[in-house]
């Protein structure tokens, strides 16, 4: 499980070796964490934005 936090509503990348996907395990922010809008993943890892703070399971 990886914690990834958007501070000051800025986009933040969190390093992760993603093979099959990422699942949001627990949202820690009042700001919504919506896949494809305020969080997602790519070859660099997990990204969050607009105040999304959450814990993610990497598969």
Map each language-model feature to its residues.
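Extracellular, modular beta-sheet/disulfide-rich ectodomains of secreted and cell-surface proteins
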Residues: 1-59
């Amino acid at each position: 499980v990886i914690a990834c936090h958007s501070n000051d509503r800025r986009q933040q990348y969190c390093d992760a070796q993603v093979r099959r996907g990422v699942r949001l395990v627990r949202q820690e922010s009042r700001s919504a964490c919506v896949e494809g809008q305020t969080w997602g993943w790519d070859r660099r890892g997990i990204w969050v934005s607009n105040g999304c703070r959450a814990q993610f399971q990497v598969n």
